[in-house]
Amino acid sequence: MKNLLKRYVSIKNIIKVIELDFFANLKLRYYKLAMKLFKIEDEKFDEILLKAGMNAVSSTYLPVVFLTSIILGLIIFIIFLIVFNIFYAIFGLIGGIFIVILIGVLYPYVLAEEKAKSIDENLPYAFAFISALSSANIPVVEIFTSLSKEDIYGGMSKEAKEIVKDTKVFNYDIITTFLRRARITPSKKLSSVYYNIVASLIVGAEMKNIFHEIYERLMEDRKLELFEAIEKVEILSEFYVIACGMIPLFVVMTVPVASSISAILQTASLFGDPKLLPLTFYLWVPIASIIFMGLVYGILPKDFKLNVSLLDVLKEFDEPEIEGIKMKFKWKPVHFITLFFWMLSIISFMLFFIRKSIFKFHGTDFLMFGILFLILPFILTSYWHFIIENQKERYYPIFLNDLTMAVRSGMDIIRAMQVCARTNYGPLTKIVKKMAIQMSWGRPVNEVFADLERTEKSLIAKRIASILKECAVSGGDVKDILTSVTVHAYKLSEMKREISARQFIYVVVIYLSFFLYIGTSYIMVHSLLPTLLKNIHGLSVEFYKNYLFQGILIYSIFSGASLGILTERSIIAGIKHILLMLIVGYMLFKFYIGG
């Protein structure tokens, strides 16, 4: 039986090899045909292909693009000729050829631009890593070898891999390697940095000082770029307040006024059509909010993003697991809170079904409460995770400072970690104690920091952990590396505080527009609408009141989510704003405006 199985596997592998050879030969023949039909070569395009990291040259790539465009154009021509007529077929042929050529030519430019963006976003943080390791007098090639293993640095990690390949595989010297990468890299900023490094190497400057100066300059540049991004977001925020705050108010005020005038003059009016209200609240506000969130998410950089996912939240409700083995289930506070809210949810659904009214709350109110209480544990848990990760970020600089001071006093890193484990670092305390215990048991320090890098959700924490891990592996002067990391952590913390301070004003503006909406609703329901709708048949104050109430709920949800994206680049961060606006808006409408 085993022999039969081995034969089956070997036959299967032979078939795979034959298939691969067949497709490889077919691909080669296709390339040869394209190059024979179209002899095109462009040096500038060769440069773009190189910067995009595509293993191709213009004399091969462009002919393949042109031949592919003609083949696809002919296929479209035949299909359109059968389905439509000769006019559509010719149009499809020309259009198909043009679109394929356009995509084929633009693709390397887009790829190069994406690579440049990834490099520029990670450049200052990669040089924080390089500067920290160079402070321990680690050779330049070894520093870039360490950087090449850290995927969290995105495009810079790939650049480091290319440098390592050139020096260790192709045996280029370090100066030739940097000069070559300066010409090839798609990032103009990195190209300039490479030339600075080469100049420093030629004159024999001390590299740790050069790397530190480059890091300082790059951090200042990144800070300016972040502030420029915030300025763009500030402009978008002003448009958002107008689009989702002022325009709905304008529609709400205009429709009854226009309806009243139309009734008096006995003429139809577009602005007096009540259908504008559902269009405004159900379409305009959600679409405008989603567009705003998409634009802000695209503009704001990922420098301080917290990767809190739904999977992390669901783990809180699951049985604990260690290396695939299910442990005994233990009740946690989150389980009791969930049970409490679900009991409230069941009571709310029961009140809805028996049509019971309590105070000013009716059937539909209890239905909404039931749904809210059902999902509230997951919402609150996800936000709790977000708060914990945010607080851990704030304590990292303090922890690193204490660790550095302990090491500088003469302790080794294991003893220093045990001393730090006695200090209170808020949510970070548990992690510090865990690391100290693992180190005291004899686990390698680099493995402990590697675990920290893998488990942390914050990019800031991951970058710090990556430097600490390499610090343990490199065997350099730990004191200098820790000092460099601590300074870097404080700089990041300060930068994040400055950005948050600038964004706070727009949080206030969006809240003001929310309360303005509630205030306007109160005036309309109690003063304006009863007078205007007195002589209009088919429309009542209750009709407008329902739309105003729904408008508050919709505005609360989308404005809260927008604030989360605006402040922390995460909808989870907007949960507190959503809940606050929903509760305040709901209660004010029910008890003061009338629901």
From Swiss-Prot:
Pfam families in the record: T2SSF
Annotated signal sequence range: none
Q: What is the lineage of its organism?
A: Archaea, Methanobacteriati, Methanobacteriota, Methanomada group, Methanococci
Q: Keywords in UniProt for this one?
A: Cell membrane, Membrane, Transmembrane, Transmembrane helix
Report membrane topology. Multi-pass membrane protein
Q: What is the designated name of this protein?
A: Uncharacterized protein MJ1286
Spans through the membrane: 64-84, 86-106, 239-259, 281-301, 334-354, 368-388, 504-524, 547-567, 571-591
- Tell me the InterPro entries matching this sequence: ArlJ-like (IPR056569), T2SS_GspF_dom (IPR018076), T2SS_GspF_sf (IPR042094)
Gene Ontology cellular component list:
plasma membrane
Q: Which domain of life is it from?
A: Archaea
| Location in or out of the cell | Cell membrane
The yes or no answer to whether the keyword Magnesium is present is no
Q: Which family does it belong to?
A: To M.jannaschii FlaJ.
**Would the keyword Transmembrane be found if you checked this record's keyword annotation?**
yes
Which organism does this record belong to? Methanocaldococcus jannaschii (strain ATCC 43067 / DSM 2661 / JAL-1 / JCM 10045 / NBRC 100440) (Methanococcus jannaschii)
